Regions:
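Short coil-to-helix segment of the ABC ATPase nucleotide-binding domain corresponding to the Q-loop/switch region
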Residues: 38-46
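H-loop/switch region of ABC-family ATPase nucleotide-binding domains
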Residues: 139-140
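Catalytic Walker B motif of ABC-type/P-loop ATPase nucleotide-binding domains
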Residues: 104-107
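ABC ATPase "signature
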Residues: 163-164
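Conserved signature/switch motifs of ABC ATPase nucleotide-binding domains
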Residues: 78-81, 99, 131
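ABC ATPase NBD coupling module
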Residues: 2-26, 57, 172-173
Protein backbone atom coordinates (compact mmCIF):
# COMPACT_ATOMS: atom_id res chain seq x y z
CA UNK A 1 0.00 0.00 0.00
CA UNK A 2 1.29 3.45 -0.87
CA UNK A 3 -0.33 6.08 1.30
CA UNK A 4 0.74 9.69 1.66
CA UNK A 5 3.90 8.92 -0.38
CA UNK A 6 4.88 6.20 2.08
CA UNK A 7 5.04 2.51 1.15
CA UNK A 8 3.63 -0.05 3.59
CA UNK A 9 4.30 -3.75 3.05
CA UNK A 10 1.65 -5.60 5.01
CA UNK A 11 3.58 -8.86 5.22
CA UNK A 12 6.27 -7.08 7.24
CA UNK A 13 4.56 -4.01 8.67
CA UNK A 14 5.75 -2.84 12.10
CA UNK A 15 3.60 -1.73 15.04
CA UNK A 16 4.98 1.79 14.59
CA UNK A 17 3.87 1.85 10.94
CA UNK A 18 0.42 0.55 11.90
CA UNK A 19 0.10 3.33 14.48
CA UNK A 20 1.18 5.91 11.87
CA UNK A 21 -1.44 4.61 9.43
CA UNK A 22 -4.16 4.63 12.09
CA UNK A 23 -3.46 8.27 12.93
CA UNK A 24 -4.14 9.23 9.31
CA UNK A 25 -7.29 7.17 8.77
CA UNK A 26 -10.78 6.76 10.18
CA UNK A 27 -13.50 4.17 9.69
CA UNK A 28 -17.29 4.37 9.61
CA UNK A 29 -18.95 0.97 9.84
CA UNK A 30 -22.39 -0.10 8.65
CA UNK A 31 -23.60 -0.90 12.18
CA UNK A 32 -22.36 2.37 13.78
CA UNK A 33 -20.21 0.68 16.49
CA UNK A 34 -21.25 3.21 19.14
CA UNK A 35 -20.83 2.65 22.87
CA UNK A 36 -24.41 2.20 24.09
CA UNK A 37 -23.55 3.48 27.58
CA UNK A 38 -22.07 6.76 26.30
CA UNK A 39 -23.72 9.89 24.96
CA UNK A 40 -23.21 11.08 21.40
CA UNK A 41 -20.55 13.52 22.59
CA UNK A 42 -18.81 10.88 24.70
CA UNK A 43 -18.78 8.51 21.71
CA UNK A 44 -17.01 11.17 19.66
CA UNK A 45 -14.52 12.18 22.35
CA UNK A 46 -13.61 8.71 23.68
CA UNK A 47 -10.97 7.98 21.03
CA UNK A 48 -9.51 11.46 21.28
CA UNK A 49 -9.06 11.15 25.05
CA UNK A 50 -8.04 7.49 25.31
CA UNK A 51 -6.11 6.80 22.08
CA UNK A 52 -4.83 10.27 21.25
CA UNK A 53 -4.23 11.29 24.89
CA UNK A 54 -5.99 14.61 24.33
CA UNK A 55 -7.10 16.78 27.25
CA UNK A 56 -10.80 16.32 27.95
CA UNK A 57 -11.70 20.00 27.42
CA UNK A 58 -10.01 20.05 24.00
CA UNK A 59 -11.67 16.76 23.03
CA UNK A 60 -15.08 18.11 24.03
CA UNK A 61 -14.56 21.23 21.92
CA UNK A 62 -13.56 19.13 18.89
CA UNK A 63 -16.38 16.66 19.55
CA UNK A 64 -19.01 19.40 19.63
CA UNK A 65 -17.70 20.90 16.39
CA UNK A 66 -17.83 17.47 14.73
CA UNK A 67 -21.39 16.84 15.93
CA UNK A 68 -22.39 20.34 14.78
CA UNK A 69 -20.94 19.58 11.36
CA UNK A 70 -23.16 16.50 10.96
CA UNK A 71 -26.28 18.33 12.13
CA UNK A 72 -26.46 16.99 15.69
CA UNK A 73 -25.78 20.10 17.77
CA UNK A 74 -28.96 19.41 19.73
CA UNK A 75 -28.05 15.78 20.50
CA UNK A 76 -24.76 15.98 22.47
CA UNK A 77 -26.27 14.35 25.57
CA UNK A 78 -28.40 11.72 23.83
CA UNK A 79 -27.57 8.04 24.13
CA UNK A 80 -27.63 5.81 21.03
CA UNK A 81 -30.97 4.30 22.13
CA UNK A 82 -32.47 7.80 21.94
CA UNK A 83 -31.25 8.40 18.38
CA UNK A 84 -32.56 7.22 15.02
CA UNK A 85 -30.35 4.99 12.89
CA UNK A 86 -29.44 7.95 10.70
CA UNK A 87 -28.50 10.01 13.74
CA UNK A 88 -26.40 7.15 15.12
CA UNK A 89 -24.56 6.88 11.82
CA UNK A 90 -23.95 10.63 11.84
CA UNK A 91 -22.45 10.27 15.34
CA UNK A 92 -20.14 7.62 13.86
CA UNK A 93 -19.20 10.04 11.07
CA UNK A 94 -18.59 12.81 13.62
CA UNK A 95 -16.33 10.43 15.55
CA UNK A 96 -14.37 9.81 12.35
CA UNK A 97 -13.99 13.46 11.35
CA UNK A 98 -13.05 14.50 14.91
CA UNK A 99 -9.72 12.70 14.43
CA UNK A 100 -8.94 14.94 11.42
CA UNK A 101 -8.02 12.01 9.16
CA UNK A 102 -6.54 12.20 5.69
CA UNK A 103 -8.98 9.52 4.50
CA UNK A 104 -12.20 8.04 5.85
CA UNK A 105 -13.17 4.47 4.97
CA UNK A 106 -16.93 3.89 4.84
CA UNK A 107 -18.19 0.29 4.91
CA UNK A 108 -21.72 0.40 3.50
CA UNK A 109 -22.70 3.30 5.76
CA UNK A 110 -26.37 3.27 4.73
CA UNK A 111 -27.06 -0.47 4.49
CA UNK A 112 -28.50 -0.71 8.03
CA UNK A 113 -30.74 2.34 7.60
CA UNK A 114 -34.37 2.78 6.66
CA UNK A 115 -34.63 4.36 3.19
CA UNK A 116 -35.94 7.62 4.70
CA UNK A 117 -32.82 7.97 6.87
CA UNK A 118 -30.34 7.17 4.11
CA UNK A 119 -30.59 10.67 2.65
CA UNK A 120 -29.39 12.43 5.79
CA UNK A 121 -26.25 10.28 5.96
CA UNK A 122 -25.52 10.67 2.23
CA UNK A 123 -25.98 14.43 2.59
CA UNK A 124 -23.29 14.57 5.29
CA UNK A 125 -20.97 12.45 3.14
CA UNK A 126 -21.64 14.68 0.12
CA UNK A 127 -20.70 17.72 2.22
CA UNK A 128 -17.45 16.03 3.27
CA UNK A 129 -16.64 15.26 -0.38
CA UNK A 130 -17.35 18.88 -1.35
CA UNK A 131 -14.92 20.01 1.37
CA UNK A 132 -12.22 17.82 -0.18
CA UNK A 133 -12.26 14.90 2.26
CA UNK A 134 -10.80 11.78 0.68
CA UNK A 135 -13.20 8.89 1.17
CA UNK A 136 -13.14 5.25 0.17
CA UNK A 137 -16.76 4.11 0.21
CA UNK A 138 -18.12 0.60 -0.16
CA UNK A 139 -21.72 1.23 -1.21
CA UNK A 140 -24.72 0.02 -3.14
CA UNK A 141 -25.96 3.62 -3.47
CA UNK A 142 -25.15 4.00 -7.16
CA UNK A 143 -26.79 7.41 -7.59
CA UNK A 144 -24.60 8.72 -4.78
CA UNK A 145 -21.50 7.04 -6.22
CA UNK A 146 -22.22 8.53 -9.62
CA UNK A 147 -22.55 12.11 -8.40
CA UNK A 148 -19.94 12.19 -5.62
CA UNK A 149 -17.09 9.90 -6.64
CA UNK A 150 -14.26 10.69 -8.97
CA UNK A 151 -13.22 7.04 -9.24
CA UNK A 152 -15.41 3.92 -9.18
CA UNK A 153 -14.23 0.36 -8.67
CA UNK A 154 -16.80 -2.35 -9.39
CA UNK A 155 -16.03 -5.65 -7.67
CA UNK A 156 -17.59 -9.07 -7.71
CA UNK A 157 -16.52 -12.02 -5.56
CA UNK A 158 -13.49 -10.06 -4.33
CA UNK A 159 -12.19 -9.37 -7.83
CA UNK A 160 -12.07 -6.00 -9.60
CA UNK A 161 -14.31 -6.22 -12.66
CA UNK A 162 -13.89 -2.64 -13.82
CA UNK A 163 -12.53 0.66 -12.61
CA UNK A 164 -12.44 4.16 -13.96
CA UNK A 165 -13.71 7.67 -13.52
CA UNK A 166 -17.31 8.02 -12.44
CA UNK A 167 -18.20 9.37 -15.88
CA UNK A 168 -16.45 6.51 -17.73
CA UNK A 169 -17.90 3.86 -15.45
CA UNK A 170 -21.52 4.98 -15.62
CA UNK A 171 -21.65 6.33 -19.17
CA UNK A 172 -19.22 4.12 -21.07
CA UNK A 173 -18.54 0.86 -19.21
CA UNK A 174 -16.14 -1.52 -20.96
CA UNK A 175 -16.92 -4.87 -19.35
CA UNK A 176 -20.07 -6.88 -20.15
CA UNK A 177 -20.57 -7.68 -16.45
CA UNK A 178 -20.54 -3.97 -15.62
CA UNK A 179 -23.02 -3.22 -18.40
CA UNK A 180 -25.36 -5.95 -17.13
CA UNK A 181 -25.10 -4.62 -13.56
CA UNK A 182 -25.84 -1.05 -14.63
CA UNK A 183 -28.88 -2.18 -16.65
CA UNK A 184 -30.28 -3.94 -13.58
CA UNK A 185 -29.91 -0.97 -11.25
CA UNK A 186 -30.76 1.79 -13.73
CA UNK A 187 -33.96 2.74 -11.86
CA UNK A 188 -32.08 3.12 -8.57
CA UNK A 189 -29.88 5.87 -10.01
CA UNK A 190 -32.66 8.21 -11.13
Amino acid sequence: LIFDNEKFEFDKITKKEIARLRRKTAFVFQNYNLFLNKTALQNVTEGLIVARKMHKAEAIEIGKKALDKVGLSDRYDYYPSQLSGGQQQRVAIARAIATNPEIIFFDEPTSALDPELTGEVLSVMRDLANEGMTMLVVTHEMGFARTVSNKVIFMEDGVIVEQGSSKEFFENPKEERTKAFLRTIQGDMD
